[in-house]
Amino acid sequence: MDNRTARFLKTRFQKYYKNAEIGLPDHLPNREWAFIFFDSMPDKMMHRHKAFGSPGEALDYLYGMAPAHVYNSTAYYEYPDARKMNEKNWLGAELIFDLDADHLPDAPKNYADMLELVKKETFKLMDFLLEDFGFSEQEIELVFSGGRGYHFHVRSPKVLKLGSAERREIVNYLSGRDLDFKYFFREVAMDGEFGTGSKTFKGMKNVPFKCTLVGYDSGWGRRIALYLTDYMKAECGKRYKKDMFPELRRYEKVGDTTIKKLISLTNSENGLKDILEKGRLDFDVRNFKDIAAYFMRESVEDFLHRFGTSVDEPVTADIKRLIRVPGSLHGGSGMLVKKLALSELEKFDPLTDAVVFGERPVKVTVLKPFSVQLKGKDLRVEEGIQEVPEYAAVYLICRGVAEYGHRRNQPGPV
């Protein structure tokens, strides 16, 4: 990035920061801040160990300096501006999750498709936080990163003092990597508060057992019930019986009679409903518990792809992490780091809703062919001098595929 291009971006960012609504963190005086300035680009030298005593001080700094990237600590410190980390006196930290397309298997290369995939992962993580961990919506802050994903900030006394090891355990739970299906498919005693039917014969108590899906109504048990019943419905929706349940036909305990009973169970009035709502596995299908457990083991990769979520483990485990500030601009895209209510995620379109610059025509020198969709328009540029809307110019320059103005001996638009 040449000096003229850096100056152009800085003036555009400064104009934005003049009236920007910045999501300043709670306990502002206890947060460390860090910045990358346009003057250091493209080296991206980070200036950190900065602290602010008041909102006005922080906002004045952003307007005056117009940084390319703005971060604050997820941790709370007694002395956030201390130059050495061991002198800051760590007081606790938010629980942070970073969902980025870089960490998703087979993420599409197209930017719009990439963001759509990350949004689906974001919904899955939201379900974990609200349903499995029981955090309230008021304890969760959702932020579009301004780049390729989303950040979750969990601010709760329950997580404040968690160490790195405990935070890694949470990541493991989210991924499902340590799931043991034997735990979920079990025989449970029908005695006492769990049921009736115990009998005593010759002084010996006989306690009957029933096959059940443990935890069917919450957490991973609920996801197993959904996956299993969805599979059974899909198989019975096939046209020919010979094509149904091919995965189960490979199991030694499954023959033609079992397949017929599985079809009958699936098509019955309450069969799948009983699995979902009661965790029931004691049907007129021999070894149904073992068959279900076998299917889950064989399908574990697809199951975890559907229900697990891939967060950036080092980010969550780091109790002294720096993260982008909501309301700031992402120097790698020029887009807004935007805070969202959880209810806003469904309709949120980052390629429109996180674009803050206007339509004023700007001449740029495109360094290589590039295409992207912004503000509902397909933008395609070729190498050479191009005139594009300001929002597109900022994006192209931040992505490193264009420079401001025009160079000599560069071809103009055809």
Swiss-Prot record:
Disulfide linkage: none
Pfam families attached to this UniProt entry: DNA_primase_S
InterPro entries per record: DNA_primase_S, DNA_primase_ssu_euk/arc, DNA_primase_ssu_PriS
Top EC class of this enzyme: transferase
Annotated Gene Ontology cellular component terms: DNA-directed RNA polymerase complex; primosome complex
Superkingdom, natural source: Archaea
Names of required cofactors: Mg(2+); Mn(2+)
EC numbers: 2.7.7.-
Keyword annotations from UniProtKB, A to Z: DNA replication, DNA-directed RNA polymerase, Magnesium, Manganese, Metal-binding, Nucleotidyltransferase, Primosome, Transcription, Transferase
GO biological process, one term: DNA replication, synthesis of primer
Catalytic residues of the enzyme: 98, 100, 312
UniProt-recorded Gene Ontology molecular function terms: DNA-directed RNA polymerase activity; metal ion binding
Primary role: Catalytic subunit of DNA primase, an RNA polymerase that catalyzes the synthesis of short RNA molecules used as primers for DNA polymerase during DNA replication. The small subunit contains the primase catalytic core and has DNA synthesis activity on its own. Binding to the large subunit stabilizes and modulates the activity, increasing the rate of DNA synthesis while decreasing the length of the DNA fragments, and conferring RNA synthesis capability. The DNA polymerase activity may enable DNA primase to also catalyze primer extension after primer synthesis. May also play a role in DNA repair.
Family, similarity comment: Belongs to the eukaryotic-type primase small subunit family.
Subunit description: Heterodimer of a small subunit (PriS) and a large subunit (PriL).
Name the record gives this protein: DNA primase small subunit PriS
Organism in which the protein naturally occurs: Methanosarcina barkeri (strain Fusaro / DSM 804)
Gene behind this protein: priS
